[in-house]
Amino acid sequence: MVLTKAELIGALQHETNILLHLAGKIDRTQLDYRPTASQRSTMELLRYLSLMGPQLTSACVHGAFDMAAWGAADGAAKARDFDGTLAEIATHSATYAALLADVSDDDLRATITLFGSSGTRGARLVSMVLSGCAAYRTQLFCYLKSCGRDELNTMNLWAGMDTPASA
């Protein structure tokens, strides 16, 4: 794998930090915002993000998707309010580290099949989990921009921080 396990965990933890930074920019009066009728609302997107990464990481680690675990996590996510959802997302950094703690380099190179597609465990972690986190937080960023947060920029999206003030 091109990334070390520590780098993968660090990248997933960085995604968590970026997501929490962006979520902190949400105007609570706009939690029901959705770009079109068929898309998730801001709150629905956050709830999905509160379970997607850890659940797919677990699937990759175990080499099998657990629909019952996903359903339970989805039910719990749907019951959370905004603050509870952010609190759950805040646990992801530790969750990723715990889920990947006992995964060896050999485990990362092992082939698994998920959702009808085979690849190495490491590649699936990158393509499904890490890429998914980046994609969905970018969707949240676009929602924020659509809701008038014009001051948000590349620093917010990729570094998870506001642009530093000029000296």
Residue ranges and their predicted role:
Residues 1-11:
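Extreme N-terminal tail/first-helix region
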Residues 29-30, 106:
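Secondary-structure boundary/capping positions in well-ordered alpha/beta enzyme cores
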Residues 101-116:
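Acidic catalytic patch
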Residues 5, 82, 126:
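Flexible, glycine- and charge-enriched loops at secondary-structure boundaries
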Residues 58-103:
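Helix-adjacent hinge/juxtasegments
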